[in-house]
Amino acid sequence: MKLFAAMSSVLMSASLLFGATTAQADQLESVQQKGVLKVAVPQDFPPFGSVGTDLKPHGYDIDMAAYLAQKLDVKLELVPVTSANRIPYLQTGKVDLVISSMGKNAEREKVIDFSAAYAPFYLGVFGSSDETVTSAQDLSSKTIGVTRGSVEDLELSKIAPSDATIKRFEDNNATLSSFLSGQVSLIATGNLVVTEIATRYPAKAPQTKFLLKNSPCYVGVMKGEEALLKEVNRLITEAKQDGVLEGFSQKWLKAPFPADLGA
């Protein structure tokens, strides 16, 4: 009898373990059954995610989360996170997805999976509309403003022609002022900085000339959740084709969605 009881206990434990593993292995089904999609989003990083004057979250990432929830036909639950805790929240099941202006790198790929890119995030050379610049070679004999010691300074220095003049400023504000005042007609900076210029000074909004360093944003998915990852990727592809991401980019980044954004 004791042996039978012991075997029954082992079988029951194995059954429970198998059931738990199966449930965890299909998070998409779990989301659909619960009718709720929990998404980790930023709360202090405009224009991707911040709290507005109405005390509600707004931004590119917020709109992306709402789009996915709507397409999955479930309610959306936004979970504010920081850069430090967004991946742990995903790993511990506190959220189903991370949509928090997150870039992809080798270390992160060891612990979570990433969707296709859904938003542009990059450093580049930007300038006025009358500057016909499309590559580093076109910077020959031109002057480019940049913040001293920044990543964009380092990237620009690697590729600028020897006869290009790199005019370095001590901080971002000085770099932006040099462009707005007409001191320089080209600057190397990030697309979010350009978004800020376009928001405050629409008539002087610089145009993207070419990229220096590309690090687009991806949706984070728990490792091994293939069904959920596949569905998120399908919806991102649909959003590209239907112009949804173009709308998000124009609304929040004041720029077109890049046609060649990395997968």
Regions found by a protein language model. Name each.
Residues 26-101:
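Extracytoplasmic small-molecule ligand-binding "clamshell" domains
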Residues 28, 127-144:
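Flexible hinge/capping segments at coil-to-helix
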Residues 85, 102-110, 155-158, 180, ...:
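A ligand-binding cleft/hinge motif common to bilobed small-molecule-binding domains
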Residues 62-71, 137-138, 142-143, 149-151, ...:
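Extended ligand-binding regions for polar small-molecule ligands
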Residues 37-38, 73-75, 92-100, 143, ...:
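Alpha-to-beta junction loops
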Residues 62, 77-88, 167-177, 181, ...:
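Short helix-initiation/N-cap motifs at beta->coil->alpha
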Residues 151-168, 205-208, 237-263:
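Ligand-binding clefts/hinges and TM-proximal coupling segments of bilobed small-molecule sensing domains
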Residues 119-127, 195-237, 255-263:
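Periplasmic-binding protein-like
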